[in-house]
């Protein structure tokens, strides 16, 4: 259904040609698409766009870098990758005249990155504030509105699937830190290293 709409709007017939995974999925509809070596994707001239869904910075960075260098467009929601290597990857994309899209790395479905880079391209920013992490927003709301303890609110968030089993990235502020680094870099036009941002979690509230 989505593919039909995309073809109507773009004129392009979009199809998945390869899926990179170390695992095997025998008997599945995508079994024939699986490859275990990134080179099979990088060297395939018929593949125009690479979607990175691995997470983390390595080997995601190396794979994305090589895809851009080979002239392929790349899209990702990997905030850790963008926060650590976004400037370098954008530079490569510009040099190769391809797109490196990472809208989904901050704000989910909110088009905040495109808004910053396009709608407010001529503006000067003094401050960026906002709720950048849904898990901590849920926990703090439960604590404030219903008087729940941090531990109970976190457990509820995990049961509902809002929080990971290992919630450290969210509750210690690492996720938000990476997101604000990305937004700050885009707003100021300067590389902001997430490791230089003072970060506090919510575990002691």
Across the structure, where does each feature detected by a protein language model lie?
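Conserved active-site and cofactor/substrate-binding residues in soluble primary-metabolism enzymes
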Residues: 14, 36, 45, 84, ...
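NAD(P)-dependent dehydrogenases' Rossmann-like dinucleotide-binding region
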Residues: 125-136, 198
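General beta-strand structural signal in soluble alpha/beta enzymes
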Residues: 34-36, 52, 75-77, 100-104, ...
